[in-house]
């Protein structure tokens, strides 16, 4: 594995962990989590969400991420505008049920470009390619 491939993979994971931390930070400031009488179930969900970035090297990281993202969709719809769509794609699995086909196709294209660059040993900036593909310049 080339240095550029390793760097691209690290950059890809780091980008998504940043989005995850950003979402967690924003969620912490929203009801029901800021309520004085926040139900225990909601506090436990928030604690599980807060613990997720630290679990990135664990085998069940993707599965835990899927479960938590799906729980956001089902139990905390008010948080959906804060949830980066990239995280649904990143964790995959059942999360994909909440993405329209066109959105999935864009993320597939982005992954294909990343894998092609890695296969060819080319440098690849996930953030730059994502911005170009999603029209975020």
Show which residues each predicted segment covers.
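Alpha-helical oligomerization segments
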Residues: 109, 113-137
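Amphipathic protein-protein interaction modules
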Residues: 60-118
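N-terminal hydrophobic signal/anchor transmembrane helix of membrane proteins
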Residues: 47-64
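Short terminal alpha-helical segments
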Residues: 2-51
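Short amphipathic alpha-helical segments that mediate assembly, nucleic-acid/protein binding
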Residues: 16-20, 42-45, 62-66, 89, ...
